[in-house]
């Protein structure tokens, strides 16, 4: 049975009670940092701006190295604050230039998440995680087999950007190696709404990483109420993990569809576009799996759905399709569609005047491609154990054959 952990049960990291907790400044966006400097430190707002630039532009975490701060202010910062970035367990480059980091979450060494940098001509995209594991159970995703532990804090989310940007030698507004961020790593971002939105604010802030709103993309499996809330609280690009254009098939791939079927999902996407003149399209991600969702009829269903969406928002190319060849992982029952089937599927969509691209597989030699991230999860569900038993049963059957 596919298990879905609903948002109400997802909890953030427990607060330590053994000693007064210092404020991790990575947990704060500009507004929060200004408030902390005024209320806790009794300092002017511009001091918060200075510190924010030290952290995100120069990658300095030691207050004593922030040379334009006075000695008294540095002492107050040492007393009340800290800058804790994720610990890098390992970093692994791919032959195609993709780079993956395994980052420890917390101090117990039991949980870790993966972050991936994907360079391309004229751009560099960072794929960022939002949870340790995932609260959903999409049947074709490696992360789902690991179960779920907890939401990431704002510091742990923006810390992934900090680690990658520092490694790349990224200098905001000058030498920009990191041009795009996609919330497409481990986890469902909208199940960790507040922390994700706060982190995306830092990504887009000139005192942070200075990315344009359209260059920060949040990908969701389709939490309809949270899409509506996102429309009022942020202005980033929206991507939807669709993977099927009919409810019966999508429910087997994305169990959340049982709660929020395709019609409701598409209506929420239309509301998202209507909510701001800055938004002109939604990207619909469609992972192609051999014999599952890659047949001509599936393409025609998707084309009809995209035309209906364009009509609903009265805009051509409001719905863009990103076809993703399935990336296998150990124990999966799915296979990647053949190149012939992928191109035939795309042609049907293009002939129907649906803007469609095929995502080039990157980083699969280091298990960094879409759907392959799994990290290290102390599972609070039964999913990891169930998947392990499935693998063992499969090995026994293979040995007996």
Swiss-Prot record:
Which keywords fit this entry according to its UniProt record? 4Fe-4S, Cytoplasm, Disulfide bond, Iron, Iron-sulfur, Metal-binding, Methyltransferase, rRNA processing, S-adenosyl-L-methionine, Transferase, tRNA processing
Miscellaneous:
Reaction proceeds by a ping-pong mechanism involving intermediate methylation of a conserved cysteine residue.
Per the record, the similarity remark reads:
Belongs to the radical SAM superfamily. RlmN family.
Catalytic activity reads:
adenosine(2503) in 23S rRNA + 2 reduced [2Fe-2S]-[ferredoxin] + 2 S-adenosyl-L-methionine = 2-methyladenosine(2503) in 23S rRNA + 5'-deoxyadenosine + L-methionine + 2 oxidized [2Fe-2S]-[ferredoxin] + S-adenosyl-L-homocysteine; adenosine(37) in tRNA + 2 reduced [2Fe-2S]-[ferredoxin] + 2 S-adenosyl-L-methionine = 2-methyladenosine(37) in tRNA + 5'-deoxyadenosine + L-methionine + 2 oxidized [2Fe-2S]-[ferredoxin] + S-adenosyl-L-homocysteine
Disulfide partners: 127-370
Q: State the encoding gene.
A: rlmN
Decide whether keyword Disulfide bond is in the record.
yes
**UniProt-listed InterPro entries:** Aldolase_TIM, Methyltransferase_A, RlmN_N, RNA_MTrfase_RlmN, rRNA_lsu_MTrfase_RlmN/Cfr, rSAM
A biological process (GO) of this protein is: rRNA base methylation
Q: Which organism is it from?
A: Xanthomonas oryzae pv. oryzae (strain KACC10331 / KXO85)
* Described function: Specifically methylates position 2 of adenine 2503 in 23S rRNA and position 2 of adenine 37 in tRNAs. m2A2503 modification seems to play a crucial role in the proofreading step occurring at the peptidyl transferase center and thus would serve to optimize ribosomal fidelity.
Name assigned to this protein: Dual-specificity RNA methyltransferase RlmN
């Amino acid at each position: 049975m596919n298990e879905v952990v609903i948002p109400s049960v997802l909890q953030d990291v427990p607060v330590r009670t053994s000693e007064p907790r210092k404020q991790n400044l990575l947990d704060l966006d500009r507004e929060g940092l200004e408030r902390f400097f005024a209320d806790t430190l009794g300092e002017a707002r511009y001091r918060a701006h200075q510190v924010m630039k030290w952290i995100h532009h120069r990658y300095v975490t030691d207050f004593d190295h922030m040379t334009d701060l006075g000695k008294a202010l540095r002492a107050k910062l040492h007393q009340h604050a800290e800058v804790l970035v994720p610990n890098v367990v390992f970093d692994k480059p791919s032959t195609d230039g993709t780079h993956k980091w395994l980052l420890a979450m917390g101090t117990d060494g039991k949980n870790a998440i993966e972050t991936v940098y994907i360079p391309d001509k004229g751009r560099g995209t960072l794929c960022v995680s939002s949870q340790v594991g995932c609260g959903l159970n999409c049947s074709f995703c490696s992360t789902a087999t690991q179960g779920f532990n907890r939401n990431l804090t704002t510091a742990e989310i923006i810390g992934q950007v900090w680690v990658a940007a520092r490694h790349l030698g990224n200098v905001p507004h000058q030498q920009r190696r990191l041009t795009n961020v996609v919330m497409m790593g481990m986890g469902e971002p909208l199940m960790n709404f507040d922390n994700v939105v706060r982190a995306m604010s830092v990504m887009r802030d000139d005192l942070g990483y200075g990315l344009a709103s359209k260059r920060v993309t949040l990908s969701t499996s389709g939490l309809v109420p949270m899409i509506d809330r996102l429309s009022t609280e942020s202005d980033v690009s929206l991507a939807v993990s669709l993977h099927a254009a009919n409810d019966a098939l999508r429910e087997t791939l994305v169990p959340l569809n049982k709660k929020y079927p395709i019609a409701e999902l598409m209506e929420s996407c239309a509301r998202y576009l209507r909510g701001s003149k800055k938004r002109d399209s939604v990207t619909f991600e469609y992972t192609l799996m051999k014999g599952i969702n890659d047949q001509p009829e599936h393409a025609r269903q998707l084309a009809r759905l995209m035309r209906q969406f364009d009509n609903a928002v009265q805009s051509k190319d409001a719905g863009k399709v990103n076809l993703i060849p399935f990336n296998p992982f150990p124990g999966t029952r799915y296979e990647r569609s053949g190149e012939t089937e992928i191109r035939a599927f795309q042609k049907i969509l293009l002939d129907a005047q649906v803007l469609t691209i095929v995502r080039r597989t990157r980083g699969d030699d280091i298990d960094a491609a879409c759907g392959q991230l799994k990290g290290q999860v102390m599972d609070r569900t039964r999913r990891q154990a169930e998947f392990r038993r499935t693998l063992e049963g499969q090995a026994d059957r293979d040995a007996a054959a």
